[in-house]
Amino acid sequence: MDFWFILGVILKMAFILGVALLLYAPVFVLFERRQSAMFQDRLGPYMGGVKMPRAVIDNIPALQMGGYASAAGAAVTAGLALVMIARGGAEDPGLWLLPISWGTLFLLAAVGAPAQFVGAKVLPYLFHHDRLTLFGGLHAVFDAVKAFTKEDIIPPKADKFLYAIAPIIAMIPAFALGAVLPFGPDLHLEWLFDTLPAEGIIEGPVAHLQVASLNVGILYMFAIGGTGVISAAIAGYSSDNKFALLGGLRAASQMVSYEVTLGLSLVGCFMLYDTLRLEEMVRWQSENSFLGFLPAWGIFYQPLAFVLFFFASIAEYKRVPFDAPEGESEIVAGSFLEYSTGKWLMWMIGEFLEVAISSMLIAIIFFGGWDVPGLSRSGWEAFGYHFDLGGTNWEFLSTFANAHLTVTLVSIGAFLLKALLLGILSLQVRWTLPRFRYDQIMQLCWKLFLPLSLLNVFVTGILILLFQ
């Protein structure tokens, strides 16, 4: 292995984990706390913040009005540039001796106007009274700092070794699963600022935006994800607490049961895509169409599989309404009842990492991954027409919009946005459905989800044979 390969692996793994830990996890925590505050009619995550000088707080209205004025000025500039282009004026406006065209000026102003308006609109919400709270996002940061600085209490009769490693084991599957998730198309390093050809093989160095491309990619995810049951069982056993033991037993049986549905619900997708590689699944969805005009995303071909996999994944990471293993009204807190401070926070981090990884996997299999309708590797196109504006006024816009680096960044952003929305949807279920009893959870798995999964496999196989 050479230096650049190792560096690439480290950077790609850091990107996946960084997005999950530093973007998704805080957003999920903030969303969940805001939802709970709304339902319980309380303040919410706004107590944690940085105290700001009085002069800054008093000048927020003035800053907001300045933002509105700046947005209005940018909008007027965009309109002026558009009028000059329409009237066929000089292509070089000669503003401050800057070598830019009217088209470039229009692009900058058209992007800047709404950005400044939104910035002015949200400015007051960054503060709560005299504190900078960033929409309540700093509250979670302060909670994490507090958790790792408080005393770690260990039950006197607990198995100290198993008690200590259980939360670590809970985090390992989430870290390992990120290695096979493709988060973008291949990056051709010699074509970053050029437009890729629509067809053919492209020579030159390529950076695959995936740590490991395995021919058993999805099976690897099931194999590694299934080891999470070990941590719950160990935590329940080692805590020397009967409620924790009951929670561990519940978690183990529930996770093992729903893994069956998780696997069977995706068999139809394997048959459709004819591959187990996650990146090939995305390519199949991006290269085909559904009914001739819709993207060939898995949710259109396998809607039942999506519903089954979505709810089975919620049961797998034990979120409401499938949180019987940690039901507060029955067994207090389940397998991690005796955990506190940093170790308890590790359980929470592992749980939200599972939500993030599961959302990314659903986005890849059912929502085209990084695929964006109307965007191909050669740039923006629709109904056979390629986005290419003539004239030097629009040269910068056309070149920038179709550049390989722009296409790649938009694709990565689309994938991350899909996963984020799916994660928020799974958290929304918590505040929509009541908790099921443990027996109801098991009956739902074996009497409804499993038969429907088998039916989906049977119907998919017949349809593929008929239309192949």
Predicted segments, located by residue:
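Selective transmembrane helix interface/packing segments
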Residues: 1-468
